[in-house]
C-alpha cells in the first residue's frame, strides 16, 4: 500500500523509536467523553481531495488529527479533517489508555503495533501467535496481543499484531470498526467553469449573518466541516468584504442541511434567457421496447464555480457569545439557491451529452435537471448505448448511483410511472385534514391539477369554491359537502385509472372537448391506440366570457400544448355548431387563428345567443328602467304603444331593479320580435356579451328563457338622463308618486293656496323686537310628521324685507311638542309683530338618506365634456405629444391618460413600446406604517457612488442626494438639507453605521424628528424605501443615455418618480405630498380662526336623537358646518341638522 513500509531489519535506532512513540501535546489529547464522527481524507494534490466521512451505519465515531494535516482537529469537532498527502495522515488514539501517534492507512488490511509502542503500553496482555507479514527486506516476525482502542468515546476491543516496524498502522480492520469511510471529493477538474459576471454598477452582497441557536450552530459547523473536507468550500480570504447569511434545517432523517440566502446576490448577477421552459411529458414520448431511467447524484457539487466569482458567495459561521472570531468560507462549486446554478448545470450536461445525441439520433434521450431517460428498440443496442452514456458522464466527474439506476419496469420519472406499453401518473390518495386551511386546499388543488393530465375527468370546481374570500394561508376554510363529494369522486377515478399511451408519429391526433355539469371544460388527446394525455380548464364565467369564447380560447391553449409536446396540432371535436363559431368570430378580435374543427352539437345553455341581433327589429320597442326610492326598489317599463307598468321590489340594489325591469318587459310581451332599450350599461353588457354559463339557479336564467321563446331580440343601451324621450318616460314611470299628508292641531297654523307649498305660522300676540335682539315666539301648533319626512320652519319674503331673520330649524318625525320660532331682528329699526300676522312658514319635505361618495377629480371620460352624441377621436391628435412626454420622462400610463385625455389602453401601449419601462417589475410586498410627514431613508450604490434617498411614506415622494462618503458627517449635512426643504416629523432607517452614529442621532433629536431603526432588508420595516430604491435606479438608467453625469440623471429621475408616475388615487406623488401639506396648513388656520369665531349652533349627530350645544362653529360652508364634538372631535354636520344662533350670553 501507499503507506505500509515494513522492514525485516532487526535494528531500530533510538531516534526512530522516539519518533514513532512520541506523544501529542496535552492540549490536543482526545476527549474520550465526547462522541463524534471519524473522517479520513486523502488528497490527490493540494486542491483536489479525497475524504473518509463517518459511516452511515455508525453515528458515533472518532476524530483524527494528523501530524502534517493542513487543518488539525479541535475539541468539539464532529467530522474529520482534510489531509494533504505530501505528509503522513496521522492522529492520536488511546491504546490500552496510552496516547499514541498512529498512521491511518486505508490500504493496509491489518493493523500493526510497533514494538516501541507495545513496550510503552500502560498494561499489556498475553502474547499469541501472530501471522507473518512481508516487508521490504522479507518476512517479519509478529505476535498478536489483545488491546482496547479508544477515540472520542468509541471503545473497541480487538487484537493487533506487534512487529518491529517504523510506525504503528491502523488498517482497514480497525478503521471500519471506528466508522471510517473513504469518499472521493466530487468537484471535477475535467469540467471547465463558466464565466459569471455582475451587472454593471452593482456590488456583491454585504448582509451580516444573523444569530443561530446553539443546536443549529452545531449543525452548521458539522455540515461546513464535511463540505470543507470534500473540497466543496474553502476558507475565505482576509480581504473578502462580501457575505450572505446562512441558516440550517433538520431533515426527516435527522441530518442537518445548510442553506444560504443568496437573494441579494441573485439580484446583482447578469442572467441570460431561461433554457428549460417546462417539464417533458410522457404523452410526447415515442413508444419503445426498452427504457432506462438514471439519476445524477450531487450534480451541483460536481461543477466548479468561476474562481473570480467565488468571493461573492462568502458566508460566516458565528459563535455563541462571540467566544471566538467568526469563520468565513466561500463556495468552490455551484451553491444551492444561486440563480445561475440550474442554467450552468443543465448547459454543462447538455454539452457533455451532445456527442451521444449526434452519434445515436434514433435514441430518445431526455434530460431534465438530474433525471435522464433513455429509450430505444433492441436490448443489446440499449445496453451498449447505456454503457456509453455512463462513460460519457463518469469521465467528466459525474456520479450515477446504482441505487437510482432503473433498468426494470415500472420506471419512476418526473412524477410519472412508465412501462414499455403505457404510462400513468404515480398514484396518490387525495386526502383532506379535518379543519383545512387555505394552504391545505391549495396543495390539494395543485395535486389534482397535476394528476389531471394522466387521469381524465378530475374536477376542482367545488373544492376551489371553498377558498373564496380567503386571503391568509393559515385561514380556516369551510369544507362543504359538495367539496367532499367531489374529492371522493376524484379518488374513485384515480383508483380506476387506466394506463395512457405513447405517441405514434405515423398517425393523426384527435382532441375531444366536453363540458362537465360544473362548467369545467375537459379534453383528451387521442390516437388509435388510446388516450395520450388529458387536461381540464375552469371556464371563466366571472370575467363575462361566453361558453363559446371559453372553449375557443381553450382550443388555442390545447393546440399550443400539443405543438410543444409532439410538434403537431390535433383535429378538434367540439360540442358546438359552426354557426356559433362564426358568430363568435365576428366579435372575437382576440382569436389569433382557428384550428381544424369537427362540429358535433350545440353547447349547453348557449343557443339563446343566436337570437340576439345587431340591428333593430320591426317589432315593439320597450324602454326599461329601474331604481330605488326611499330604500325600495322599483322596476318599470314603457312600450312604444303607450303601455306603462311599475312594480315595487322591496329592498334590492339598483342593478337588480334594472334587471327585473328587463325581465318584466320580456315576460309581458307576446311579440316574437322585440326591441329592448335600457340605460343600464351593466345589464346591456351582461346580456350581449357576458352570459353563457348560467343554470336554472342563476338570477339571469328567466331572461335567458324568455329570449329563447322569441324569434329575434335587439338590445340597445342609451345613457340615462340625456333627454331621450323614451328613456325619460321610463324614468318617470319608475318613480313613486304619492301625496304627503300632515296631521296638525292649533290655531296659529293656516293652510295656503293649492299652488303654494306648506303652511303659514301666525303670531300668537303682539310682539316688539328691538334691533339685534332675538326672541323665541311660541305657538300652539303641534304636528305629526309623516314617515320618511321632516318639517322645515323658515321665513317669509315679506318679513325678510323688514330684516326679520327666522331661525326655526328642522322638525323630525319623533317631535310632538309645540312649535317655537326663533326670530332675530337684523334690520336697522325695531319690528312690531301683530297678533294673527303671518310671519313664518312650515314646509314638509321627504327625507333621503342616500350615502355620499367622494368627488373623483381624476375621472376621465373618453367622450369629453360635450355630453351625449359628442363621441369622437379627438384624442388621436394627442398621441404624439404623449409619446414625446414618455420618451423624455418615462411617465406612467395613468398619468399620460389623465394629462393628454387619451384612453388608458393607448397609454399602456405607449409604455410597453419603451425598452426601459418594459423591464420594470413589482417590488417586494410588505406591511409598513404610512402617514404624512413620516419618511424612510436608505443609502444605495450606483456607478461606485453613494445615493442617500428619503421617501415620504404617505405619498411616495422621493428626495435624493449624492454623498461623497457614507459617514456620519456627510449624512448629517444631507439630513439638514432635507429638513430645510420639508417638515418631517419622523424618520425610519436601517441599522447602518452612518444612521446610528451619535452625531446623526443627536442631530435628529435637535430637529425634533423621531428616529426609529429596523432590520435591514426586512419588508415590514424597509418596504417603502426598498421599492423606491429599485424604482429610482431604473429611472436613472433610463436617463443615462441622454446625460453626461450621474448627478444629472439623478435629478431627471427624481422628476420622473415624483411627477411622472401615479401614486394614491391616480395622483402623482408630488400632488399627493403638496395636497397633504396644504391640508395641514389649512387645519392650522382653521383652528386659529375658530378661536375668534362668533358663530354658535345647536347640532344633532346622525343616528342620535338629542340636540347638542350650543357650541362654537369652527367653519361654515354651503352645506355643512364644522364643530368640535366632545366625544368625536372635529366633525362636519349637515346644515339640515344644525340651528345657528348668536353667541349666547
From Swiss-Prot:
CDD domains: Rnase_HI_RT_non_LTR, trimeric_dUTPase. PANTHER family: ENDOGENOUS RETROVIRUS GROUP K MEMBER POL PROTEIN (PTHR41694), RNA-DIRECTED DNA POLYMERASE-RELATED (PTHR41694:SF3). The lineage of its organism: Viruses, Riboviria, Pararnavirae, Artverviricota, Revtraviricetes. Residues 1095-1143 bind DNA. GO terms for molecular function: aspartic-type endopeptidase activity; DNA binding; exoribonuclease H activity; RNA stem-loop binding; RNA-directed DNA polymerase activity; RNA-DNA hybrid ribonuclease activity; zinc ion binding. It comes from the Viruses. During replicative cycle of retroviruses, the reverse-transcribed viral DNA is integrated into the host chromosome by the viral integrase enzyme. RNase H activity is associated with the reverse transcriptase. Residues 920-1077 form the Integrase catalytic domain. Residues 616-739 form the RNase H type-1 domain. Residues 45-59 have a biased composition (Basic and acidic residues). This is Pol polyprotein. Pfam families: dUTPase, IN_DBD_C, Integrase_Zn, RNase_H, rve, RVP, RVT_1, RVT_connect. Its EC number is 3.4.23.-, 2.7.7.49, 3.1.26.13, 3.1.13.2. Residues 29-41, 66-76 have a biased composition (Polar residues).
